[in-house]
């Protein structure tokens, strides 16, 4: 069975809840919750999921592994 690598269903959800769900689905990856304008490193990391939130703390981009 393949492991989950993206969470389109979390767009529109509070970022804190999204991070919790990703952690439950994939405890082997680190979850980074990023506010608008946060600096990003361009490195590829297959053990990371970035959760991009808007000014209201809502996920606005599909969280995916390694992006």
PLM region spans:
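Exposed, flexible binding/inhibitory loops of compact, secreted disulfide-stabilized domains
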Residues: 1-67
